[in-house]
From Swiss-Prot:
InterPro entries: PEP_COase, PEP_COase_bac/pln-type, PEP_COase_Lys_AS, PEPCASE_His_AS, Pyrv/PenolPyrv_kinase-like_dom. Its cofactor is Mg(2+). One of its GO terms (biological process) is oxaloacetate metabolic process. GO terms for molecular function: magnesium ion binding; phosphoenolpyruvate carboxylase activity. This is Phosphoenolpyruvate carboxylase. Belongs to the PEPCase type 1 family. It comes from Shewanella sediminis (strain HAW-EB3).
Length: 878
């Protein structure tokens, strides 16, 4: 195993050694020796050496206050460097075949063309793919942007050091730069001093595009074009854009009072500003490239027979882009722009049409080779990013919209909308939607909360359609939730039909999703508004928190099947929007497998998926990584469309239904019905302390006074991953599998795992979570932190965990977890000796801070760093 990952281990060793030297330089030999001793004891403890565990605990609990922060920092930064080495390994020249699977698009094209699908159908599918990746802020994206940039530079150096042509002197220079970077990382505070604002989060999303995706999109499309040309002899269109990007950063106001209409306007301006600035950089380079004279008649006529026709057109574009950047700079700085507004880029066509004219001229003049360089890259960036860079979604809770109408109906003396039944609401909304008179009086002065919702709708009305994506209604459950938003958009003067998307989140709402959409499709006015296209969002986080992962997964699958069927009957094209998180408890996991495990017919060339916080960095943070991720998404959506999985057999459905029912009962018997559960959760995890971390712009709770129901899905999962019990990602599932086994259904479960991608993916995700769970560490937290009268609950939870692991091992016919995915197992094994000491210290620090009236600054900072370190080691936070 060690040989298989030799280059990975070598890089981990190099980075760890340099970190050690940095620590020695800044502290002393004795401290470094203590760190190394703890690391070795953690390794031995992992192999079952009880004496080593006791010795390690003795050292950790004896750490003086002044050593707590450097200790936590050392292990945290080692885990971050291990992540970097692993991330780099997947794109490294030395990557072994178990990690670097063959190119997924290449493989798929071969399979499709050797099946009975003809070439034209395949090309048509590829050219019409509509994959929309929606970047969302992540309240538990621990790493600061400053450090993320330094980590990216470390990867650049690891890549440079792989170059066999480097001279000894060049190698020395790279090693020196590596030492400098790791020293900078060591001396940088890894914990933010204050929460990021929604604008900070939006800027973080834009920086991912600038440093990675801006390059990755044309690189990926060039690679895709080569693969298609090799197989079919055909070229892809210049404006192909199988993958596009949207964002929630600065648009998602659900439970976030800091996302106001003013903030959304600033983010829209920033999106456009970043796009203009990056296009300007490209055009400046292109002016130098296109020094050629020969041109077709169209271009010569356009430039009055100029001697440098290409440059003349590009210089004009360059000036317009400069004016656009200046105009947006002035807006962002709060000045009135003193610029001729006719001389800036307002529409995508202002940028695209002149460039297309140059492209036609070059190809007509026998210079296709030149046309297919930077010029084609820019055209493909325009097809992907437009002039707004990201299409901004707006998201708000259904209740907030109802409150607007209710306040309005009370003001108008029509009664209280919130007290009407559903049929009364629909009748009123449709009457107003089809009527001509305005509903909102000019002298109406709404309350602050209502005014904010109305201001957001008024802002939408002023924006170009292409600057915006969907209006997502969270906690949607009935047709009136959708019609209410449509009425607000109409009343505020929205000139374009914005997509209004219900988000079905709880178990009940998922089960009722198809009947809600059936009712909407039955309304003629609504059918006319949608023009035969409907988007529906499936919520993963809240349904899993509500019902547990197994029952939620089946409800999501079943809801999608029913939505596909009602859309087919209504002759409506359905796009499903998957609100997945980074963790298993929030629908996370490998995107490729997740897409292929969707119900047959539910993808059909179109999909929207959220990409969150730290997962954006892991998948798209480097151009090469981003190209891999784009290829995975493209191949998965094509495969799900052209080669969909088989329909599940009736006996599989019946078994899955029973598993879902038993798992939700097992899950809720603890989370809802166990009277001591909330007290245990708050004591055994750092849930309360997490609220003090300056992580995201959004509050951790929907309501300050609420229990588990009011807690957002992300901190709920984050807290359990810190004490390593990982409870939300498995509770209920293992018990249901064991019950099925006890009924004699193990052979059926094994058949399902073998032949049904949906079930196989569920079991694979469960196996990964079980491998990351550490019952002994969770028990240590309990010993340190939980009142003795609640220990019985911890014992019961750990017994359930053991039951689940046993059931999964029997199902997969394995002796050890992740036996069939050695790369994932290696990844977990590599980190454990560094995470364990952080966990032990975290439990100790939690006990200290809870006993003391006021914890010392050292203790508080060290606690925050242990939280960051465990998150880095677990490779998923919430």
């Amino acid at each position: 195993m060690a040989d298989m990952y030799a280059s990975l281990r070598s890089n981990v060793g190099t980075l760890g050694q340099i970190l050690g030297e940095t620590i020695r330089t800044n502290l002393d030999d004795a401290f470094l020796e203590k760190i190394e001793q703890i690391r070795q004891l953690a390794k031995s403890s992992r192999q079952g050496d009880e004496a080593a565990r006791d010795e390690m605990l003795k050292l950790l609990t004896a750490l003086p206050d002044n050593e707590l922060v450097p200790f936590a920092k050392a292990f945290n930064q080692f885990l971050n460097l291990a992540n970097i080495a692993e991330q780099f390994h997947t794109i490294s020249r030395n990557c072994d075949e178990l990690v670097c699977v063959p190119d997924p698009v290449e493989q798929l094209l071969g399979r499709v063309l050797s099946s009975n699908i003809d070439q034209e159908k395949m090309l048509d599918c590829l050219e019409n793919l509509d994959i929309d990746l929606v970047l969302t802020a992540h309240p538990t994206e621990i790493s600061r942007r400053t450090l993320i940039q330094k980590y990216a530079s470390v990867i650049d150096i690891l890549a440079a050091l792989e170059n066999p042509q480097l001279t000894e002197r060049e190698k020395k220079q790279q090693h020196l730069r590596l030492r400098q970077l790791i020293a900078q990382i060591w001396h940088t505070n890894e914990i933010r001093n204050e929460r990021p604002t929604p604008v900070d989060e939006a800027r973080w999303g834009l920086s991912t595009i600038e440093v990675s995706l801006w390059q990755a999109i044309p690189d990926f499309l060039r690679q895709l074009n080569e693969q298609v040309e090799e197989r079919t002899g055909k070229q892809l269109p210049t404006d192909i854009a199988p993958v596009r990007f949207s964002s929630w950063m600065g648009g998602d106001r659900d439970g976030n009072p800091f996302v106001t209409a003013k903030v959304t306007q600033e983010v829209l301006d920033r999106n456009r500003h970043t796009a203009a600035r990056l296009y300007l950089k490209d055009i400046v380079v292109l002016v130098n490239d296109l020094s050629v004279e020969e041109a077709n008649a169209e271009l010569l006529e356009y430039t009055n027979n100029s001697l440098e026709p290409y440059r003349d057109v590009l210089k004009d574009l360059r000036q317009k882009l400069r004016n656009t950047v200046d105009y947006l700079n002035a807006r962002l700085e709060g000045h009135s722009p003193e610029i001729d507004l006719s001389s800036i880029i307002w529409h995508e066509s202002d940028l695209k049409e002149p460039l297309l004219m140059l492209y036609r001229s070059l190809t007509d003049s026998g210079m296709s080779l030149i046309a297919h360089g930077l010029l084609l890259d820019i055209l493909r960036r325009i097809a992907c990013f437009g002039i707004h860079m990201l299409r901004l979604d707006i998201r708000q809770d259904a209740e907030r919209h109802s409150d607007v109408i209710a306040e309005l109906t009370r003001y108008l003396g029509m009664g209280d909308y919130n007290h009407w039944d559903e049929s009364e609401k629909q009748a009123f909304l449709l009457r107003e939607l089809t009527g001509k008179r305005p509903l909102i009086p000019s002298n109406w002065q709404p309350s602050d909360d209502v005014a904010e919702v109305v201001s957001t709708c008024r802002l939408i009305a002023t924006q170009p359609a292409r600057a915006l994506g969907s209006y997502v209604i969270s906690m949607a459950s009935k047709p009136s939730d959708v019609l209410t938003v449509l009425l607000l958009l109409k009343e505020t003067g929205c000139p374009h039909p914005m997509r209004v998307v219900p988000l079905f989140e709880t178990l009940d709402d998922l089960n009722n999703a198809s009947s809600c959409m059936t009712a909407l499709f039955a309304i003629d006015w609504y059918r006319g508004y949608t023009k035969g296209h409907q988007e529906v969002m499936i919520g993963y986080s809240d349904s899993a928190k509500d019902a547990g992962v197994m029952a939620a997964a089946w409800a999501q699958y079943h809801a999608q099947e029913e939505l596909v069927e009602v859309s087919r009957q209504a002759e409506v094209k359905l796009t499903l929007f998957h609100g997945r998180g980074g963790t298993i408890g929030r629908g996370g996991g490998p995107a490729h497998e997740a897409i292929l495990s969707q119900p047959p017919g539910s993808v059909d060339g179109r999909i929207r998926v959220t990409e969150q916080g730290e997962m954006i960095r892991f998948k798209f943070g480097l151009p090469k990584l981003a190209v891999q991720s784009l290829a995975l998404y493209t191949s998965a959506v094509m495969e799900a469309t052209l080669l969909p999985p088989p329909e599940p057999k009736p006996e599989w459905r019946a078994c899955m239904q029973k598993l879902a029912e038993e798992s939700v009962d097992a899950y809720r018997s603890i989370v809802r019905d166990e009277p001591d559960f909330v007290a245990y959760f708050r004591a055994a995890t750092p849930e309360v302390e997490l609220g003090k971390l300056p992580l995201g712009s959004r509050p951790a709770k929907r309501r300050v006074d609420g229990g588990i129901e009011s807690l957002r899905a992300i901190p709920w999962i984050f807290a359990w991953s810190q004490n390593r019990l990982m409870l939300p990602a498995w509770l209920g599932a293992g018990e249901a599998l064991q019950a099925a086994s006890d009924r004699g259904e193990m052979a059926l479960l094994q058949e399902m795992e073998q032949d049904w991608p949906f079930f196989k993916t569920r079991i694979s995700m469960l196996e990964m979570v079980y491998a990351k769970a550490e019952p002994n560490l969770a028990k240590y937290y309990e010993t340190c932190l939980v009142p003795e009268n609640l220990h019985h609950l911890g014992e019961a939870l750990r017994t359930r965990l053991a039951t689940g692991i046993k059931a999964v091992l029997e199902l997969t016919q394995s002796n050890a977890l992740m036996e069939h995915t050695p790369w994932n197992r290696e990844s977990v094994t590599l980190r454990n000796p560094y995470i364990d000491p952080l966990n032990f210290v975290q439990a100790e620090l939690l006990a200290r801070t809870r006993k003391e009236e006021e914890a010392s600054t050292n203790v508080e900072l060290a606690l925050m760093i242990t939280i960051a370190g465990v998150a880095a080691g677990m490779r998923n936070t919430g």
